[in-house]
Curated annotation (Swiss-Prot):
SUPFAM superfamilies: all-alpha NTP pyrophosphatases
GO term, biological process aspect, one: L-histidine biosynthetic process
UniProt GO MF annotations: ATP binding; phosphoribosyl-ATP diphosphatase activity
Subcellular location as annotated: Cytoplasm
Enzyme Commission number(s): 3.6.1.31
Xref: CDD domains: NTP-PPase_HisIE_like
Protein name from the UniProt record: Phosphoribosyl-ATP pyrophosphatase
Record carries keyword ATP-binding: yes
Pfam family for this entry, one: PRA-PH
Keywords, sorted A to Z: Amino-acid biosynthesis, ATP-binding, Cytoplasm, Histidine biosynthesis, Hydrolase, Nucleotide-binding
NCBIfam families assigned to the protein according to its UniProt record, in alphabetical order: histidine_hisI, PRK00400.1-3
Amino acid sequence: MSDNLSQADILARVAATLESRKPENGGDPEKSYVAKLFKKGDDAILKKIGEEATETVMAAKDARAADLADEAVSKVVYEVADLWFHTMVLLARIGRTPEDVVNELARREGLSGLVEKASRKE
């Protein structure tokens, strides 16, 4: 990570890039993987998130089986990055940003997980 960019800056830059890849913003599915996902629609994006979530779970299981060897843990980080990226594509698709997720995490910070879960509307 660049010394001049914060983690929030990087998320914001990725979000801006995703926004620019939307068809209504000139994203070209012939030149951009993300534009192609947007063109294919929600089901393609959700399928990709499911695939990346499964790959993350499998990498985590492999890392544990490898006694958390550096290479195996690096694979988990790699897969989580793919998962985050594709969930960011979904967020862009529904008009939200990583900032919205960070705000939700900030709202939950310090709350008991049980209290937070009980407060959810069914």
